[in-house]
Amino acid sequence: MKHPYHIVSLSPDGKTMYAAAARQVDRICLETGECKSTVVEESATRTTTKTGDKPAAAKRTKYLPTSVSHVRSLQLSKGGKYLLATTDETKSLVLLDPTTLEVIKKVQYPKRPSAVATDKEDLNIVLGDKFGDVYGESVEDLLKVEGELKDEPVLGHVSMLTALELGYDSKDRPYVISADRDEHIRISRFPASHVIEQFCFGHQQFVSSLLINDLDASILFSAGGDDEIFVWDWLNGKQLQKLSLREHVESYLNEAHIYVDKKGVATTHKEITVSSLQQIKDTPYLLVNVESTNAIIVLKIVDNKLEVASVFATEAHVISFSVAGNLLVTSEVGSEGVKAYTITDGVVTKSDKEIPFGSCEYEDDSELISLFSTKSLRKRGEF
């Protein structure tokens, strides 16, 4: 049985594609077709528990099933020195060599990682977890850690961390930009992250994507469970724009987007969840995918505002996408291999490039991972 790639990520030059399927990571050279694979996570064995404290309880020992730890995120560090993977059951950050896929270091965190970012020199890594804590460590110190990280977090939110970025001001001073499930975007100094510099308020739903403008580092884009993409002057906490996507994706929404009310009754309203927001490096173009749709929306930055340049229909629902230069790759539902597209002046067309890789083998359903999970961040009222 085959598990599709649930993450695809291109190198900045577009010559290499990294991908994750369940607990496997692949490195595909797009020029030669060579594929290297590594299993980042073995099965995580859960401990057994007894159902009582009497001698006979030994006969009633409850054996919990072995769990499978999946790769939850996969990305190159900003400087390109490391391939970073995070896992769920083992709560780990794994540093891989981008060329060989050799595991350089595996560090276990107290709670499950939910977001990770690096500085531009690859000297520091910040990682947020599902309980809202953010850890900031130098790579040098991480390489010395044995077992679980014991350091204290550098900052904390009251809800799950959903996205992280490291930004810089005009004097090249670093800041942690952190977002959570409670619609908050916080700007904190780094490494003195107890000093909160600013908040960016405006989201009504969770924030799952943060992106600093490659052409102007003072501008931040954010998206998540709202209909809109937000544009910020992040250091001043000023909202510059919010661009609605609804009219552009309405025809692509389906039963997966239907809102079910507190009584469990399906309504006519369909909810939008942005699963990914990426910029084509050194260009004014951004690409957006709304989860569980077969649409890629191309946005253009004009005077620090966004406008829709085009909407492209893919062959099937997009699981994950990545862009580098004029190359766009997508992992799509039911596809035998990764799809390749060409982007020219904001217009997407089908490419002649063939990428036969798009999945890995799995043995049982415990290895399957949810392909469309971003929408689960949306909070529901009590019945």
Curated annotation (Swiss-Prot):
GO terms for cellular component: cytosol; nucleus; tRNA methyltransferase complex. GO terms for biological process: tRNA (guanine-N7)-methylation; tRNA modification. Keywords: Nucleus, Repeat, tRNA processing, WD repeat. It is found in: Nucleus. Pathway: tRNA modification; N(7)-methylguanine-tRNA biosynthesis. Disulfide bonds: none annotated. WD repeats lie at residues 66-105, 156-200, 202-244. InterPro entries: Quinoprotein_ADH-like_sf, Trm82, WD40/YVTN_repeat-like_dom_sf, WD40_rpt. The keyword Nucleus applies. Its main location: nucleus. Forms a heterodimer with the catalytic subunit TRM8. PANTHER family: TRNA (GUANINE-N(7)-)-METHYLTRANSFERASE NON-CATALYTIC SUBUNIT WDR4, WD40 REPEAT PROTEIN 4. Required for the formation of N(7)-methylguanine at position 46 (m7G46) in tRNA. In the complex, it is required to stabilize and induce conformational changes of the catalytic subunit. HAMAP family: TRM82. Belongs to the WD repeat TRM82 family. This is tRNA (guanine-N(7)-)-methyltransferase non-catalytic subunit TRM82.
